[in-house]
């Protein structure tokens, strides 16, 4: 052991950088039937064809904001793993309190 303690936050030997796959156009993974099911749950009977792209755009912006806040909480705590509590606090910060995930 090199005496760095929990997490090993020292400099280390460097190691190989991991290559991350560039993620793009994943918003299309939110399929038309998935959006339709969400609308049905909200009580919508009939859906315009233009709704699907608009919904994807709105969902993308919402998730970007929540994830940015959750990652900020995570970085402040000097962790590399985003926990459910980070997400709960991020949602609370935006005025959308979520119950049932601890805290």
Swiss-Prot record:
It holds the Pfam family CENP-T_C. It is found in: Nucleus; Chromosome. The keyword Nucleotide-binding does not apply. InterPro entries: CENP-T/H4_C, Histone-fold, Histone_H4, Histone_H4_CS. Residues 1-14 have a biased composition (Gly residues). Signal peptide: none annotated. Residues 17-21 bind DNA. The modification N-acetylserine is found at residue 2. The lineage of its organism: Eukaryota, Metazoa, Echinodermata, Eleutherozoa, Asterozoa. Residues 1-20 are annotated as: Disordered. Transmembrane segments: none annotated. Keywords: Acetylation, Chromosome, DNA-binding, Methylation, Nucleosome core, Nucleus. Core component of nucleosome. Nucleosomes wrap and compact DNA into chromatin, limiting DNA accessibility to the cellular machineries which require DNA as a template. Histones thereby play a central role in transcription regulation, DNA repair, DNA replication and chromosomal stability. DNA accessibility is regulated via a complex set of post-translational modifications of histones, also called histone code, and nucleosome remodeling. Belongs to the histone H4 family. This is Histone H4. Its main location: nucleus. The nucleosome is a histone octamer containing two molecules each of H2A, H2B, H3 and H4 assembled in one H3-H4 heterotetramer and two H2A-H2B heterodimers. The octamer wraps approximately 147 bp of DNA. One of its GO terms (cellular component) is nucleosome. The modification N6-acetyl-N6-methyllysine is found at residues 6, 13. The modification N6-methyllysine is found at residue 21. GO terms for molecular function: DNA binding; protein heterodimerization activity; structural constituent of chromatin.
């Amino acid at each position: 052991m090199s005496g760095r303690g929990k997490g090993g936050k020292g400099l280390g030997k460097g190691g190989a950088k991991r290559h991350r796959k560039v993620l793009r156009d994943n918003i299309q993974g939110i399929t038309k039937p998935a959006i339709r099911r969400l609308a049905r749950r909200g009580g919508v009977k009939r859906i315009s064809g233009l709704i699907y792209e608009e919904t994807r755009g709105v969902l993308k912006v919402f998730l970007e904001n929540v994830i940015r806040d959750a990652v900020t909480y995570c970085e402040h705590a000097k962790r590399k793993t985003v926990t459910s509590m980070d997400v709960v606090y991020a949602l609370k910060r935006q005025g959308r309190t979520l119950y049932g995930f601890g805290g």
